[in-house]
Amino acid sequence: LKPIDFSKFYQLQSAFGNFGGSMYLDGKPFPYSYLELSKPTGKYVDRTILKAINLLSTKGFIHYAGNACSPGLQFPEISNSGHIAIEDANNCGVQIINVLGSPLLSNAVTISAEPFMNLQIRESWKSFDDYISNMSSKYRVRTNKALTTTENYSVQALSIQQANEWIPQCAQMLGHTLKDKTLAISPNISAMLHTFVRTLKDDFKVWGYYKNAMLCGFISAIDSNDGTYAMHLGLTDQAAEDSLYQRMMYDVIRHGIENQSQFVCLGRTATEIKSTMGALPLENSYLFFTKGKILTWVIKGYKKFFHRTKSYQIRNPFKD
């Protein structure tokens, strides 16, 4: 997994509405944002608490390196010294950094995150058929079944020039899909999607899935010089029952192969499902920095008593 061009990354980060500026990690600048959390259902976390966190963040109390709306595109480099020098012009209360691996630093609390699932594209895969042919019969049958089951869904590229027409519906489907899965939902999903379209232009790909002339799902991806990153996915409940999720993932893999990408990052969540497609987990974690003793105690308490790492079993769909 290789990061996208830093200048392009910074341009995207600075275009988000919650962009804050730059923090310095061991003297190197890295963009940060004011953390935005949302939980429309209120199923797991009291929305009042989330509003309080968001208020603290907008007041400059919590700084998040990068943006939770664009995970996995860049990771700050962490030295092996066991300590990182972090400078923040506003000297906020808490800084949160998503990094590869699980480094132990003397001035940070490390909390594990769900792995990013990354598929390395083999040189022998000149087409999507080559990719399927590399699978063992068991997984080849599963893949073909997922593709056959969704044959009644047609797919077409959504034009960025006509983004105003499809973004509202896609934003609604994305919010519906994520509402029980993550806290990191932008309060304004439409504006977030517009930011990707406006900033990345032709490097931002969006495909819509239609059944009976109705848009039932979409998936987006970012093309970089080295690879493809699956980004946003939204679909209706019926489309989910029809295994359209798997079809979308396979279509992004198809795009990556045809685009001669070195890898396709399928993002977080659904770890076992993505492993059946050949993706491998990429360990990453969050580093929490704070100078406040009470805040340090709270973060360590959360890690010890509340944080749970999901268990999963990695599958190998390939013959070799």
Language model region names:
Residues 1-43, 95-241:
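A conserved beta-strand-loop-helix scaffold within acyl/acetyltransferase catalytic domains
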Residues 9-13, 89, 150, 245, ...:
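Generic hydrophobic, helix-prone segments enriched in Leu/Val/Ile
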Residues 16-20, 26, 65, 81, ...:
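Feature targets compositionally biased, intrinsically disordered low-complexity regions
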Residues 30-40, 103-130, 134, 195, ...:
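Active-site/acyl-donor-binding loops of N-acyltransferases
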Residues 38-111, 227-286:
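Acyl-donor binding region in acyl/amide transferases
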Residues 55-56, 120-122, 142-145, 179-183, ...:
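Glycine-rich loops and low-complexity Gly/Arg-rich segments
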Residues 59-64, 148-151, 186-189, 237-238, ...:
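Short C-terminal domain-edge/linker segments immediately following a structured domain
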